[in-house]
Each structure stands twice: as C-alpha cells, then as structure tokens.
C-alpha cells in the first residue's frame, strides 16, 4: 500500500468519525444548549453543526408548499413501509413531496436541538405515555419563526419551558394539531419512537 493511499485512508476515516460523532450528537442536541448566546429566543438560535453533518439537510429545509393537505393520523403513519437505506444527500421523492394534516395527536416530548436549532417533538395517537410515537420537527428557517414562538408560548401556559436549554418529556401529554411534509429519516436511537417517518418540516399547534 502506497504512503499516499494510506494517508487518504486515514483522512477518510477521520472525516467519517467526525461526521458520525456529529450525527450522534445531533440526536441529543439539547445537551449543547449552553453554547447558544440567546437560548430563550427560538428565532435567534444559531446552528452550530455544519450543514454537511445534517442528514439530508437540503431535503429537510424547505417551505411547506401551499397544496391541499391529506388527512392522516399517527396510527396510520406508523404503518407506512420504511426504506432500509436512503443516501444522506437524497432529494425528496414520492410521499415526501406531499403535505399531511394530523388533526388529533398528543405531544409527549419537545426539545430544541441546540446543534441544528430544529424544534424536535414526539407525538402519539393517544395520550398514553407508553403509546408508540413519531417525530415532528419545526426547522430553524426564518419562515417557521412564528410557529416556533407560538408553540413556545402555548407550552409556557401549561408550565412547560421550551428553549435551547430546557425541554424534554412533558409531565402529561397535550393534544395538538400538526401539519407538515412527510420525511424519512435515518435509523438512530429513538426511545419510544416507532418509525423512521416524520413530519419535517412541520407546524405543531396545541388545541
């Protein structure tokens, strides 16, 4: 093996390790809230990780198109078939280009990923804490600023603090309305979450 090839191999392994570490960290990004200069203002959250470390970044950061939303439920989404592997730069295809509306779901968990600044939420079909869940995420993009602030204010009325340093499991599930685009994420530790399918981007509103 030539020295040049060996060096390239080392660089590749180093980059792969860094990207893997960032991907793992992004699943528990709230731990990095102390890095945010204005943690309480969800519209001033500054993404720390590079776009390249964010799985399917360009596919996720899009506006929700102004088309008729299809009515669906968490229960139905949990039955959708999942692809074994999707490339990290894959564009949206098929179902991912459609908008869906969940009229009745329950918000179980809400937090801000302080690395990419997305608001990540776990929702279920029933209020039961053991019910299987799916993810809904509101991106950092400026067009979602009002939606993020609205959710933050609504949760505050229920005594729950949501910002870059606070969030997590809600003491009691709250009924919500969700509208967003279907998105298939990659496999990672998801706890109660039972599918790779998400609504991302999504706007979540408490009833």
Where are each of the predicted segments found?
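OB-fold and OB-like single-stranded nucleic-acid-recognition modules
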Residues: 29-207
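N-terminal secretory signal peptides that target proteins for export/translocation
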Residues: 1-8
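Compositionally biased, low-structure terminal segments
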Residues: 6, 17, 33-35
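C-terminal motif of bacterial Sec signal peptides marking the signal peptidase cleavage site
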Residues: 25-26
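Sec-dependent N-terminal signal peptides
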Residues: 9-19
């Amino acid at each position: 093996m030539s020295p040049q090839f060996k060096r390239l191999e080392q660089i590749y392994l180093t980059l792969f390790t860094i990207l893997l570490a960032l991907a793992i960290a992004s699943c528990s990004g709230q731990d990095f809230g102390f890095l945010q200069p204005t943690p309480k203002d969800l519209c001033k959250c500054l993404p720390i990780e590079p776009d390249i470390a964010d799985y399917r970044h360009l596919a996720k950061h899009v506006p929700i198109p102004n088309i008729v939303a299809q009515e669906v439920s968490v229960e139905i989404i949990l039955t959708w078939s999942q692809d074994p592997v999707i490339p990290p730069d894959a564009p949206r295809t098929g179902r991912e280009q459609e908008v869906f509306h969940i009229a009745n779901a329950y918000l179980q968990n809400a937090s801000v990923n302080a690395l990419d600044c997305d608001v990540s939420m776990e929702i279920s079909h029933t209020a039961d804490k053991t019910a299987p869940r799916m993810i809904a995420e509101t991106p950092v993009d400026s067009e979602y600023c009002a939606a993020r602030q609205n959710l933050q204010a609504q949760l505050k009325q229920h005594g729950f603090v949501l910002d870059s340093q606070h969030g997590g499991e809600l003491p009691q599930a709250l009924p919500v309305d969700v509208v967003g685009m279907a998105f298939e994420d990659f496999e990672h530790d998801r706890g109660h979450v039972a599918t790779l399918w998400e609504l991302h981007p999504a706007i979540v509103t408490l009833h």
